[in-house]
Amino acid sequence: MTDFITSGPLTVSPIGAHLISAEFPTGDILFLSSTAKFEEGSAIRGGVPLIAPWFGTLLDKQPSHGWARTTTWEVMDGEKISAGLEKDGFELQVDIWRTDEGFEMTMGLSNQTDNTEKVQLAFHPYFRVGDIAETTVSGAEGLEVLDRLTDETATQEGVISFAGEYDRVVLGEPIMVINDGSRTIEVTGRGHDAMVVWNPAAERAAQFDDLGEDEWRNFVCVEPALLGADLQGVDVEPGGSVSIGMVVKVSENS
């Protein structure tokens, strides 16, 4: 088990500079698998994985979702939890802090190579919900949405609900609102161009050895992401930088 860094209600693992807990009066905002692995080289199932310098395999690179989430960062605690990482010619910097209503995060990447590089950045938060079958996500209505399971694009009609595996990219910058009946979680991105919404459902979840039985019912991922035009990344010139942010607010339903 790694040593964690705590600042108020926030707990961070140095592996991935990974926010694993955000305790508030309504309960933890974040889901963490009961069988999550805290080992360098392994992704932590739950919390807020940091996705860089690419998302999934969209840029045809491995490992999926990049190396930021599986590498040990240098983490400094304080009123803000700050972390830094240098790897493969990139410098990454993350800041995490609590607010009265939840928490905020920023992640920046600078290109220290001599070449223009295509990169992608994202936060991949696992938000805790009571039951995914009773949960809705609003904010995408009327926007173009890419279904990553079928590679089809359509306009989102109505709120998002879940009845099976769900993996879609909302193209745009909406404020997304998760409602599980007992509380509301508002997710706002900064510097992003998409929101990814994901839940694996039972069949896909059974393939994960780091997710407890039926725990897929207790989270939804709503992910501010900078993916670039046609999901092919953004160009960062030598010495240049790019950043994204996320604001999370939680409130109890009346």
Language-model regions: role of each:
Residues V12, M107-T113:
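Asparagine-centered strand-capping/turn motif at beta-strand->loop junctions
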Residues E117-K118, Y126-V196:
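Active-site/ligand-binding surface loops and adjacent short beta/alpha elements
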Residues F162-P238:
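Acidic/His-leaning functional-site neighborhoods
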Residues L30-W67, G191-L211:
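Hot-dog-fold acyl-thioester-processing enzymes
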